[in-house]
Amino acid sequence: MQVTLPYGGDKTVSFNVPEENFDGFLKPGVLAPASDPVRAIERAVDRPIGSPTLDKIVRSGTRVAVICDDLSRPTPVSTVLPVILDRLIRAGVRREDIHMVMALGSHRAMTPDEIRTRVGADVYANYRVVNSEFRDPASLINLGRTADGVDIVVTREAMDADVRIGIGNIVPHPVMGWSGGGKILFPGVTGEHTVAQFHMLGGLSDQRLVGLEDSHVRLRMESWVPKIGLDFVVNTILDAKFRIVRVVAGDYIKAHRAGVETAKVLMRCRMERPADVIVVSSYPADEDFWQSAKGFFNSEGGLKDAASTMILVTPNYEGMGPHPEYGECTGDDNVGVRLKKLYDGEDIPGDPLAIAVGTSMSKLRRRCRLVVVSDGVTRAEMDECKIEHYPLCELQKAVDVTLSRYEHPVVAAVSHGGEYLL
């Protein structure tokens, strides 16, 4: 039978698999989208969870930074922003006292056209919008050390405000459990060393963290948030067609946890039995291998055992991503030793983020067999990762070769690997 998967946002690809082996597409629950998305945002903002309303948080003279996630996320920022800005202006905040910060984390800077599309043409024309900074010391400020010994270094633009509001979206995350909430600050607007801290915690953990709302990494991150200050969040939960199902707003912990409960219904898939082979599209996390590998982490829970295989079908439009050493670290069986030394404060050469995330990937590829089908990364790059690679034109070959390794394989498919959780 023929199986069709998304390949990026505007293309599909197909392969054949024996019908007797195919257990079908793994699908989560279904919830109806909001009939009026703007009204859903307004209701959430006006009835916050665990927080005062915005008119009780700001007043005339308050300087506000609205921190928005970047183009690697499907968050409908251009729909959410006007509601927030309307409430701020109505509360007396002057337009010139409001600016937007695009929370890049370690991702590349967004172009002016990308920012305009992200925030909306009207907002772009009438407000100051800046990218966060990750490495430039002159654009970062050290707020000091937390009780557990982490230096909080943050982009100055985020601190040039009395009040910070975060806009994000809730989906599974390999390290943080779920995105959203305080994650808009960590790693959104923090510097390289600080960003590396929570990725190190993820790399050092042997626990599967994706899908845990109270993972030890998230709890530590949330304990760092007061050092920067996050006064209000607005988080969306979207369905597979990126329609708003629910919006939560208010306290960065209480509102986030309420949103996670909805996200679990929309994104957690149920399986009749574990699979020998899972073919997963990275959609919508298609930007690069740094992002698309989420499809592996999200789908691992559906595998039968260590002999099982995941085949990731992904465009990787921007190649391996922003960290050139990521591939080498992924392919290093002993990269965890480097990570532990780095975490213990030793001066270890190399990109700390590549070492941290590479450790998580190195562990994953040793727990099961990984295959990447992509025209966006090369065989040489995947060889460095110790991951099998096929170009897109050989998708069928990748499936056939993989199935030939099993006597009676159980095969499943995942259409939205960047968001669905097994």
Give, region by region, the residue ranges found by the protein language model:
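N-terminal amphipathic/basic leader segments beginning at the initiator methionine
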Residues: 1-44
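Structural motif
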Residues: 65-67, 165-167, 277-281, 311, ...
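Short glycine-rich or small-residue beta-strand-to-loop segments that form or flank ligand, phosphate
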Residues: 63-74, 99-105, 278-281
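Divalent-metal (Mg2+/Mn2+/Ca2+)-assisted nucleotide/phosphate chemistry catalytic cores
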Residues: 147-150, 154-212, 221
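C-terminal non-catalytic interaction/assembly regions of soluble proteins
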Residues: 89, 294-422
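Membrane-embedded hairpin module used as a gating/binding unit in multi-pass transport
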Residues: 208-286
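An acidic, phosphate/nucleotide-engaging active-site surface
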Residues: 110-178
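Glycine-rich phosphate/diphosphate-binding loops that line cofactor/substrate pockets in enzymes
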Residues: 49-65, 90-96, 269-277, 303-305, ...
